[in-house]
């Protein structure tokens, strides 16, 4: 039996409960993982609400797409992106299904080595934000000498995008809430406060405009400022605010209508992102830990939109 977060129906946070579910045999190409930590993301809330579609036959619903843990069983034909997987390996699982649990069965293609110097919670919460950020940076063509605006520069995706852009030699200006400026300056970027007058504050720092803008916020304020300052609209990319972005002709990335999912690019970025993290060149956001049985509190914090770090469940 394994303690597992489930929802017996699509709905909201109150529908979540922790239940003991029986272990099931491994199918070919699968790996069993004893979960040490599982990251909580806004996408988990969307899935719970049925925003990604509803399949009543798949109930009870299980959430969680990012985990870290230890391999306890491997099917004979299971080979991961980094090669053979063995019992006892410390791993990261992404993307997976049903990660909010003490035990998880994952496809071998989703199982990657955990960098030795990375803690369980930090490892669990790294990849979704990092590969999304890599997608933004890659599509925008960020290169040395570019002047780049990153909106939402202290979030999991925004902070990773800021760091990746800096690693490429770009000069970065990160928009932030008041009081969070230090999280931007720590990575060698210039903080710019949100709020009325954002475009004017950015223009004062960038009188000749910017070369690119990477948006993780989706607000009209962020998107309008990006279009006003970036000369080439093809170098303004967003993972949020799709309706407004479509009106402005901004490139859309992710799972929204008309967006570029970047499936292969993101999958191929997982190992390089883990390597950067292992070398201390890519730092994730602060971790906020909850035990598994406080899953409702954890998702409530994420739903508020200003968690102040990466929320992680510990089974």
Range-by-range predicted roles:
Residues 281-285, 299-315:
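C-terminal capping/lid region of NAD(P)-dependent oxidoreductase domains
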Residues 92, 213-214, 237:
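N-terminal Rossmann-like NAD(P) cofactor-binding module of classical short-chain dehydrogenase/reductase
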Residues 220-282, 292, 315:
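Glycine-rich phosphate-binding loop and adjacent beta-alpha segment
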Residues 198-208:
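Short amphipathic alpha-helix with an adjacent loop that forms part of the alpha/beta core around
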Residues 46, 65, 78, 90-152:
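NAD(P)H dinucleotide-binding glycine-rich loop of Rossmann-like/cofactor-binding domains
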Residues 22-39, 52-97:
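Glycine-rich beta-strand-centered segment in the early N-terminal region that forms part
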Residues 130-195:
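Mid-domain Rossmann-like dinucleotide-binding core that forms the NAD(H)/NADP(H) cofactor-binding site
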């Amino acid at each position: 039996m394994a303690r597992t977060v489930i929802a017996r129906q699509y709905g909201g946070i109150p529908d979540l409960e922790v239940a003991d579910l029986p272990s099931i045999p491994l199918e070919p190409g699968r790996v069993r993982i004893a979960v040490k930590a599982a990251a909580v993301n806004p996408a988990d809330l969307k899935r719970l609400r049925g925003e990604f579609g509803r399949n009543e036959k798949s109930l009870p619903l299980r959430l969680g797409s990012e985990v870290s843990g230890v391999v306890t069983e491997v099917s004979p034909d299971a080979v991961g992106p980094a090669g053979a997987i063995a019992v006892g390996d410390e791993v990261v699982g992404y993307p997976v299904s049903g990660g909010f649990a003490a035990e998880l069965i994952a496809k071998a293609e989703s199982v990657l080595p955990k960098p030795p110097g990375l803690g369980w919670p930090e490892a669990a919460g790294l990849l979704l934000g990092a590969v999304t950020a890599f997608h933004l940076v890659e599509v925008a063509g960020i290169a040395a000498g570019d002047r780049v605006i990153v909106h939402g520069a202290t979030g999991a995706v925004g902070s990773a995008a800021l760091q990746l852009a800096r690693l490429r030699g770009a000069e970065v200006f990160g928009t932030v809430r008041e009081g969070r400026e230090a999280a931007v300056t720590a990575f060698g970027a210039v903080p710019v406060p949100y709020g009325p007058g954002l475009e004017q504050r950015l223009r004062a720092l960038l009188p000749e405009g910017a070369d690119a803008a990477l948006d993780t916020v989706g607000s009209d304020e962020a998107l309008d400022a990006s279009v006003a300052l970036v000369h080439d609209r093809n170098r303004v990319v967003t993972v949020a605010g799709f309706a407004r972005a479509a009106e402005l002709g901004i490139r859309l990335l992710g799972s929204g209508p008309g967006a570029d999912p970047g499936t292969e690019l993101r999958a191929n970025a997982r190992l390089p992102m883990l390597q950067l993290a292992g070398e201390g060149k890519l730092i994730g956001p602060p971790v906020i830990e909850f035990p598994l049985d406080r899953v409702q509190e954890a998702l409530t914090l994420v739903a508020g939109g200003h968690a102040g770090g990466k929320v992680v469940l510990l089974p």
